Amino acid sequence: MFEPLLHALPYVFQPANLFAMVAGVVLGIAIGALPGLSATMGIAVLIPLTFGLDPLVGLGMMAGIYNGAMYGGAIPAVLLRIPGTPASIVTTFDGYPMAQKGEAGRALQIAVVSSAIGGMVSAVVLMTLAPPLARVTLAFG
């Protein structure tokens, strides 16, 4: 089960892939912070940037855009009470009152930590459940 994951690690940590992921996160935060633009829209708008890239680099960049936009939506939600992405609507309920009390930095820290934990947990769940689900779907014919 973990053999494919261990086989993929050298590719993930190549400098071009790391740079593309970091660039994707920065672009994603900027896109997520703009109210009205979701992570999916950000990927759709920036997908032409990936046409000239190696497929692994492009996928890493798109994953970075998605994850960055998920956090980026919390910035205007906390500071302005305007959710940047649909997923950050609930952040306005707790984050904006914290910002009104002068705890905006703490609210943004909580948002980034919860975004990172949620991303890691969902990645583990995906890696665990994808192979059995693939076998089930192949059984349909």
Question: Positions of the model-derived regions?
Answer:
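Helix-loop-helix hairpins and the membrane-proximal interhelical loops
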Residues: 1-56, 131, 135-138
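Short helix-coil transition sites and intra-membrane helix breaks within transmembrane domains
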Residues: 31-41, 78-89, 121-125
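A cross-family phosphate/adenosyl-ligand binding-site feature
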Residues: 3-7, 54-64, 72, 103-104
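Membrane-embedded alpha-helical modules
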Residues: 107-141
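Juxtamembrane transmembrane-helix boundary signature
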Residues: 60, 64-93
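Transmembrane helix-bundle signature of multi-pass membrane transporters/permeases
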Residues: 29, 45-48, 62-70, 111-116
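Membrane-interface alpha-helices at helix entry/exit sites of multi-pass transporters
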Residues: 56-60, 97-114
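Hydrophobic alpha-helical transmembrane segments
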Residues: 18-22, 59-63, 108
